[in-house]
Amino acid sequence: MSYVIAAPEMLATTAADVDGIGSAIRAASASAAGPTTGLLAAAADEVSSAAAALFSEYARECQEVLKQAAAFHGEFTRALAAAGAAYAQAEASNTAAMSGTAGSSGALGSVGMLSGNPLTALMMGGTGEPILSDRVLAIIDSAYIRPIFGPNNPVAQYTPEQWWPFIGNLSLDQSIAQGVTLLNNGINAELQNGHDVVVFGYSQSAAVATNEIRALMALPPGQAPDPSRLAFTLIGNINNPNGGVLERYVGLYLPFLDMSFNGATPPDSPYQTYMYTGQYDGYAHNPQYPLNILSDLNAFMGIRWVHNAYPFTAAEVANAVPLPTSPGYTGNTHYYMFLTQDLPLLQPIRAIPFVGTPIAELIQPDLRVLVDLGYGYGYADVPTPASLFAPINPIAVASALATGTVQGPQAALVSIGLLPQSALPNTYPYLPSANPGLMFNFGQSSVTELSVLSGALGSVARLIPPIA
């Protein structure tokens, strides 16, 4: 019987709120430092000089107190996040023990402890986030790191995270290359200090981690870090083997952006890796069949509604769906998907007051079927470039559309209150699926007509000097 009730997400949220207090402390300290510690004497007499010196000394003491308050805040924030993660990990372990699923592939059920040395979590941000705040470190740690790897020291790893002409002066390739050097230095420094390391990467920094993994795998035997001392957690990975845009159009090169489509994160990496992808994320879950315009538009909208909105509570991450890998796969990467209930394509309609949600609910089930026809939903570990023609199973599609025709009006009536919440449909296509079974399975090729074309175009484009 359990006598303690804890809400890990509330602890993580509280940690985030406390971090806001710390930001205010730092801002107050910075604002007060100049005007108060360098007071000038009101006049040239001894009394004025003594008064100015006295108040300047008080100001310096106040600055020291503010520094100590800021340091205390940082430790308190990390302690709150650690408590939330500890509760989440304990709850997951208890649940697994009671249900007999301790060896399942669920994110919280697979505790990926490293060698047992003190653990450092090097965390990187996405484009436009070169250094993560204490608040974000605490949230990521609570949701993605501690539930799997246990207690650690979260460290913000600086990387440029630029993408000219949108953000900064570095092209995407330049930003990633500099990020790899910085990350490699950070990893080596921690390993040399006797620490194990888990690297967290999101979006562009997941590409940084991908290139670092490749570089480590290319080292001569004995020079790469021991796999028992290094691991990776990647979300919104643009190099995702089955869905990342840099793999969908592998070989392509855009000289006007200095952007290389350099393929998949190695599925045969010796390093323990946890990869999380949001369904319909236009960067990490890009359509396999781009002739499906609805899928393309939905993925484009998914950049805003999915890629920028990954879950950040331990409970949400624990509900990620494990994705199947190819028969006989013995790699060290675990693949998960966050299912997306509301199609990004319909989000603007949902924003219409009063009528938006009923309209979206009415059309979403059948629209989901049409959007899902742009995806092959093959094995997660197989690098899968884009292809032209989808092997559609017409019987499965007709059945799903027929079901959606009934589910849409039913969901719309629930949304306006004419039916109870219990009447909401509880099957596909109203609910999302990691594999709706709309395609014939003719295998999963890593070479397609579009990959050959994108590779050829990339070779020609590299003859053009990059603009960035």
From Swiss-Prot:
Record carries keyword Secreted: yes
Name of protein: PE family protein PE3
Entry similarity comment: Belongs to the mycobacterial PE family.
Domain of life: Bacteria
The encoding gene: PE3
Cleavable signal peptide: none
Domain PE-PPE: 154-375
Coarse class of the protein's main subcellular location: secreted
Role: Plays significant roles in mycobacterial persistence during infection and modulates host immune response.
One GO location term (cellular component): extracellular region
Subcellular location: Secreted, Cell wall
Keyword terms of this UniProt record: Cell wall, Secreted, Virulence
Biotech uses: Could be a prospective candidate for the development of subunit vaccine against tuberculosis.
Induction pattern: Expression is high during exponential phase. Induced during hypoxic conditions. Induced in the lung and in spleen tissues of mice during the early and chronic stages of infection.
Note from the entry: The immunization of mice with recombinant PE3 protein stimulates the secretion of TNF, IL-6 and IL-2 cytokines and generates strong protective immunity against challenge with live mycobacteria.
